[in-house]
Swiss-Prot record:
Catalyzed reactions: tRNA(His) + L-histidine + ATP = L-histidyl-tRNA(His) + AMP + diphosphate + H(+)
Name of the top EC class for this enzyme: ligase
Subunit structure: Homodimer.
Residue numbers carrying N6-acetyllysine: 444
Principal subcellular localization: mitochondrion
Family recorded in the similarity comment: Belongs to the class-II aminoacyl-tRNA synthetase family.
Phosphoserine carried by residues: 67
One example of a Gene Ontology biological process annotation: histidyl-tRNA aminoacylation
Name of protein: Histidine--tRNA ligase, mitochondrial
Length: 506
């Protein structure tokens, strides 16, 4: 009966007239009446559907589809990153895309408001993961793992204002490398910076600089400048914006929005404009205010040792001690770092690319203990590669240069000039597949040879093997080079070996 409410007025009138007919007419009209009911219901449903406003097909804000062309470039970037992680002995792992909300809250400071909460499903409050670090710490605590070197590639979600033109999204991929365990100071930290340098150099993105600081130095700086301890995290979040905002704007935010005394903000300004190498570390040891703070001295001592290891790794010239680097996430406890691309003169026709940091990380010795019932700590240090921003840079450069990419890795195309040769082509392509050769054919019984050859040229397939009646009689197969258009007949039993030889030489 619930369907009757969907019927328009005319349908009701028609039904009532059928129902009120004399009894002797009801049997003959039963089938017709049932048909009219079904037709009326269907008409009502279709009308309601047609009255809905036009639905715009699009991806949600801050997300995007990746075409086959995009995926080729992305996979090359990820292959380089992952091979570097493996070269340094990391093991791969994964965690759920969503966690208990309680797992993620109070780990990100002011950024906690950017988490995506999921609708309650069966009593558990859940959120999409904001990064890959907190789930890793939860994994270590839950499984009582005390030592691990891992890498993790996966998507994360943040409700921030997306800037698609600069490679910033609400859904994006992160590539993380972390070292967990109790080790001698600064050795794992130095390796993380070495990995950053290897990846950024391998991607050939141009000159880059890795800024380093220490959260103990940041907190010590706040203390000697007169920042109330209750405002440390809030002011740290403001300082973290110096890569996007001018000092006067950051100062305005600290004073007007966060209630910091102007003279305190000015003292901070004297420090955050300092950057340099190991000589700046030595200079800060002599600073009359900073040298009186125990936390800051501990951080400076570790940075001095870190620069010694970086010199041995041959990358000290890529590292800058930068007192403006704060890293707003709450879980950092020691060394922090962030890689930025240096702006170089662009080539003719190129637009300057300003994408912010392309990699970042640091030490978080207390995060695992937040999940352990007894508060047992597992010291950790790690890094995260900003794949989306790197992909944006590579994509823009390819557009400027007019570069095209192959979307498949097909090596050989199986073709025929004659009709009714589908069975022979299927046998031949199966032989190639079984030999590990990447091969394709058209899914038609009688394709034209010109169509097949044109497909190879348009998709970049280097070799064509051609089989026809003449080749079948003579026990040979023709191999055609798509680039030179040269053809040569090869004995059928030697075909696989000849293809493998040609592919190895190309």
């Amino acid at each position: 009966m619930h369907l009757l409410g969907l019927l328009p007025r005319r349908a009701w009138a028609s039904l009532l007239s059928q129902l009120l007919r004399p009894p002797w007419a009801s049997c003959t009209g039963a089938v017709r009446c049932q048909s009219q009911v079904a037709e009326a219901v269907l008409t009502s449903q279709l009308k309601a559907h047609q009255e809905k406003p036009n639905f715009i097909i699009k991806t949600p804000k801050g997300t995007r589809d990746l075409s086959p062309q995009h995926m080729v470039v992305r996979e090359k970037i990820l292959d380089l990153v992952i091979s570097c992680f493996k070269r340094h002995g990391a093991k791969g792992m994964d965690t759920p895309a969503f966690e208990l909300k309680e797992t993620l809250t109070e780990k990100y400071g002011e950024d906690s408001g950017l988490m995506y909460d999921l609708k309650d499903q069966g009593g558990e409050l859940l959120s999409l993961r904001y990064d890959l670090t907190v789930p890793f710490a939860r994994y270590l605590a839950m499984n009582k793992v005390k030592k691990m070197k891992r890498y993790h590639v996966g998507k994360v979600w943040r409700r921030e204002s997306p800037t698609i033109v600069q490679g910033r999204y609400r859904e994006f991929c992160q590539c993380d490398f972390d070292i967990a365990g109790q080790f001698d100071p600064m050795i794992p930290d130095a390796e993380c910076l070495k990995i950053m340098c290897e990846i950024l150099s391998g991607l050939q993105l141009g000159d880059f600089l890795i800024k380093v600081n220490d959260r103990r130095i940041v907190d010590g700086m706040f203390a000697v400048c007169g920042v109330p301890e209750s405002k440390f995290r809030a002011i740290c979040s403001s300082i973290d914006k110096l890569d996007k905002m001018a000092w006067k704007d950051v100062r305005h935010e600290m004073v007007v929005k966060k209630g910091l005394a102007p003279e305190v903000a000015d003292r901070i300004g004297d420090y955050v404009q300092c950057h340099g190498g190991v000589s700046l570390v030595e200079q800060m040891f002599q600073d009359p205010r900073l040298s009186q703070n125990k936390q800051a001295l501990e951080g400076l001592g570790d940075l001095k040792l870190l620069f010694e290891y970086l010199t041995l790794f041959g990358i000290a010239d890529k590292i800058s001690f930068d007192l403006s680097l704060a890293r707003g996430l709450d879980y950092y406890t020691g060394v922090i770092y962030e890689a930025v691309l240096l702006q170089t003169p662009t080539q003719a026709g190129e637009e300057p690319l300003n994408v912010g940091s392309v990699a970042a990380g640091g030490r978080y010795d207390g995060l695992v203990g937040m999940f352990d019932p007894k508060g047992h700590k597992v010291p950790c240090v790690g890094l995260s590669i900003g794949v989306e921003r790197i992909f944006y840079i590579v994509e823009q450069r390819m557009k400027t240069k007019g570069e095209k990419v192959r979307t498949t890795e097909t090596q050989v195309f199986v073709a025929t000039p004659q009709k009714n040769f589908l069975q022979e082509r299927l046998k031949l392509i199966a032989e190639l597949w079984n030999s590990g050769i990447k091969a394709e054919m058209l899914y038609k019984n009688n394709p034209k040879l010109l169509t097949q050859l044109h497909y190879c040229e348009s998709t970049g397939i280097p070799l064509v093997v051609i089989i026809g009646e003449q080749e079948l009689k003579e026990g040979v197969i023709k191999i055609r080079s798509v680039a030179s258009r040269e053809e040569v007949a090869i004995k059928r039993e030697n075909l696989v070996a000849e293809i493998q030889k040609r592919l190895s030489e190309s």
